[in-house]
């Protein structure tokens, strides 16, 4: 009896000691992590939701919450304020922000999402707009007040040697942009190329001209994944973990875009998966642009970024020039082999 009692007591003790270990393995402690998008939830940013759905962030020890944005410029101030640790924002606007706030940078780019900026102006052909930027002369073009495509126009004007006021701006909000083009209140509007899918669904392709900034010889890096400098300095491992999970999801989104759109629809049930799939096809062209074939996703050519910094500083008459290394910090990028484009 005593032996049986001893054995059962020992078994209970072993179970009690083992239980905390089993519990800790089943529910590892996750680090809360806030990420801001540049805009609303669409196929453009589907990899973030695929990573979330498939548990890649949790696998890296992160409890990631993803919030909609208010534009690719606003993301920078959200991160600088400390409300968000990371986000998606325009790198030209980051250059301008750093130049206006000299000293130790508050925000850095850590992964180049759009290897080329998807900046376009979409114009109505019945208003005489062709793929020649000079056809915009005297026209009325809609754009949000603070929007990166609009902000980058002076770089195109400089490259083409035309005046900044070649056309007239009509300030509107993002939600009204398609409507004013369709109604004919304006002659065209600025877009991210992939954002224009909503307009393409309402007007026939043969009715529209798409003027790409890249066709004017303006080769800019676009939206990048940004991080607060406090985070990159104090906890670079956290940034690296987020980038590993996201990079994995970007690769898988390119390989299986249907799955990526399905994951996005879980978060935003009102989206049309067919429309978002078409949007992603355009997005992918800018994410996996030619440069990525040599250095992989997420990285940059230093000389190209230096030229972009010089261009932004000169065009906007900024008083200081941020160092390229302060704008883009590649130290936390995933291994090159994980970033080589597989599709």
What feature does the model see in each segment?
Residues 26-173, 180-183, 187-193, 211-213, ...:
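Short, glycine-/small- and polar/acidic-enriched structural segments
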Residues 235-317:
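Secondary-structure end/capping motifs
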Residues 92, 125, 175-270:
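Pocket-lining segment of extracytoplasmic ligand-binding domains
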Residues 5-24:
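N-terminal export signals
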Residues 56, 62, 162, 204-205, ...:
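Helix N-cap/coil-helix junction residues
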Residues 65, 73, 277-285, 323-337:
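Short linear loop/turn motifs
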Residues 305-343:
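Conserved C-terminal helix/tail region of periplasmic/extracytoplasmic solute-binding proteins
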């Amino acid at each position: 009896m005593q032996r049986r009692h001893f054995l059962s007591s020992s078994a209970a003790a072993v179970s009690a000691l083992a239980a905390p270990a089993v519990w800790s393995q089943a529910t590892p402690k996750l680090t809360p992590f806030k990420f801001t998008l540049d805009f609303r939830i669409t196929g453009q940013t589907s990899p973030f939701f695929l990573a979330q759905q498939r548990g890649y962030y949790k696998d890296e020890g992160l409890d990631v919450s993803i919030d909609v944005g208010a534009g690719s410029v606003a993301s920078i101030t959200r991160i600088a304020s400390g409300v968000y640790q990371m986000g998606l924002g325009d790198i030209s606007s980051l250059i301008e922000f750093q130049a206006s706030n000299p000293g130790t940078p508050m925000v850095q780019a850590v992964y180049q999402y759009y290897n080329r900026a998807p900046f376009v102006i979409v114009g109505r052909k019945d208003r005489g707009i062709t793929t020649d930027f000079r056809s915009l002369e005297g026209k009325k073009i809609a754009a949000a007040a603070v929007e990166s495509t609009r902000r980058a126009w002076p770089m195109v004007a400089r490259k083409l040697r035309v005046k900044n006021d070649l056309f007239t701006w009509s300030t509107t909000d993002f939600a009204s942009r398609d409507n004013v083009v369709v109604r004919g209140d304006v002659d065209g509007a600025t877009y991210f190329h992939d954002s224009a899918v909503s307009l393409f669904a309402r007007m026939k392709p043969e009715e529209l001209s798409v003027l790409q900034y890249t066709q004017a010889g303006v080769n800019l890096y676009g939206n990048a994944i940004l991080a607060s400098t406090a985070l990159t300095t104090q906890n670079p491992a956290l940034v690296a973990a987020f980038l590993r999970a996201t990079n994995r999801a970007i690769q898988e989104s390119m390989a299986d875009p249907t799955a990526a759109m399905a994951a996005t629809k879980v978060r935003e049930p009102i989206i049309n998966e067919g429309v978002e799939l078409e949007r992603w096809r355009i997005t992918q062209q800018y994410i996996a642009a030619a440069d990525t074939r040599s250095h992989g996703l997420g990285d940059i050519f230093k000389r190209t970024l230096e030229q972009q910094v010089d261009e932004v500083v000169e065009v906007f008459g900024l008083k200081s020039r941020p160092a390229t290394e302060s704008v883009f910090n590649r130290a936390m990028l995933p291994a090159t082999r994980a970033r080589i484009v597989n599709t």
